[in-house]
């Protein structure tokens, strides 16, 4: 009797085993939150969802193509933006030590401090984005000093940087400190202002140094 059950179980396992390419195609159709839960199904599922580059890029592309998914990648320190997919926030001590939090995976990555603590006369905005050319995730910080009417820019590259990199040479106008930036085709776009007019600032190839 036991031998018969073992043969039956073996046949069922053999029947239920699907080709890898079919599993990948099925997983691509699932919502992001379902993919997060399915990482614990097996080592194979975890490898596909977390490490397979083509799979990850396909899922991200499909998600961004859905209506209503073009979300701003911006969070102001000490302020929650519920529409963002990723948020950047500092601690309650008002130090410029941000963290990137992914609401889908419930994981966060702490970043080094940017500079002195935020005071009532300074404001810091951060943008989180992906550089498809270098295959890197980066954070751009913009600290605006209301007393000095100056703004400083720093960039942090995830997985490589141990500190923030100061960006120099941006003197023709100041970025509007409350503007919401969006990522379009791999570049950030947001508003900036000059003394006499408002204009649109786009981080295109000629100004790639900002990213």
Swiss-Prot record:
Every F-box domain range: 12-59
Superkingdom of origin: Eukaryota
Residue spans crossing the bilayer: none
Xref: PROSITE patterns: FBOX
Name of this protein: Putative F-box protein At1g52490
Highest classification ranks of the organism: Eukaryota, Viridiplantae, Streptophyta, Embryophyta, Tracheophyta
Pfam families found in the cross-reference section: F-box
S-S bridge residues: none
């Amino acid at each position: 009797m036991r031998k018969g059950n073992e043969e039956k179980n073996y046949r069922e396992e053999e029947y239920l085993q699907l080709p890898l390419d079919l599993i990948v195609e099925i997983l691509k159709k699932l919502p992001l939150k379902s993919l997060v839960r399915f990482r614990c199904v097996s080592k194979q599922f975890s490898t596909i969802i977390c490490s397979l580059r083509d799979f990850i890029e396909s899922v991200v592309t499909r998600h961004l193509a859905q209506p209503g998914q073009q979300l701003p990648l911006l969070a102001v320190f000490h302020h929650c933006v519920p529409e963002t997919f990723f948020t950047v926030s500092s601690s309650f001590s008002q130090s410029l030590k941000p963290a990137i939090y992914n609401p889908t995976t419930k994981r966060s990555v702490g970043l080094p401090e940017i500079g002195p603590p935020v005071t009532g006369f300074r404001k810091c905005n951060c943008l989180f984005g992906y550089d498809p050319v270098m295959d890197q995730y980066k954070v751009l910080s913009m600290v605006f000093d209301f007393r000095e009417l100056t703004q400083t820019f720093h960039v942090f590259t995830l997985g490589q940087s141990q500190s923030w990199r100061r960006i120099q040479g941006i003197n023709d106008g100041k970025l509007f400190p409350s503007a919401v930036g969006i990522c379009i085709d791999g570049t950030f776009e947001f508003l900036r202002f000059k003394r006499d007019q408002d204009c649109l600032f786009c981080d295109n190839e000629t100004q790639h140094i900002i990213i």
